[in-house]
Amino acid sequence: MILAAGRGERMRPLTDRMPKALAEAGGKALIVWQLERLAAAGFREVVINLAWLGAQIEARLGNGSALGLALQYSREPETAPLESAGGIANARALLGASPFALVNADVYCDFDLAALRARALGGHLAHLVLAPNPPHHAAGDFTLRSGKAGNAAAPRYTYTGIALVDPALVAPVRPGDKAQLAPLLRAAADAGRLSGELHRGLWRDIGTAGRLADLDALLRARTKA
């Protein structure tokens, strides 16, 4: 599942006229980079949640056949998205009962997504891909010790927006309810049911217009190299 329903407030005015997921870097929309990596990793079915200007995403991507994928859309109120956990819960009927890969549309990362397809959760409710903390999020999100993600004070790493998730993680959330994912992940960590790994490769959280411009410059430089 790709989470693509966000309003993108910090990227306005660009996101006044397009959804953040369609913002381009290196000549491609952010969500297209994600979809191409998912297809290359062997995924074939992808659910995308939509809210703000979501019709533009659906019009651009269609059924996904051009990317070798079968896309389904989970639609939310355009001006009242359900947040991360709410979006997952709302798409539960499309996702089914098996663990699934979860990816934020507004990140760029060279993590090998095929590793998520091969991973078993082993009783955990989620497995998080973490990264060293960027300057804009120096405090991090979770500790990582012996493959377990936790809530201790330090040292922490940043959640990349990439995970393997058991649908049971969002069982407390009813379809149509608004809910954040972070409290559910913290509860899973407290219960010893959150695993993780550290990715030291390329990862960018594209939360602002400045970071989008930086990623665009990086990708275009790589193309020229």
Regions found by a protein language model. Give the residues of each.
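Conserved N-terminal catalytic core of the sugar/cofactor nucleotidyltransferase
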Residues: I2, E24, K28-N104, L113-A115, ...
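Active-site metal-binding loops of divalent metal-dependent hydrolases
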Residues: R7, A105-V107
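Catalytic-core segments of class I nucleotidyltransferases/pyrophosphorylases
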Residues: F43, F100-A101, Y108, D112-L121, ...
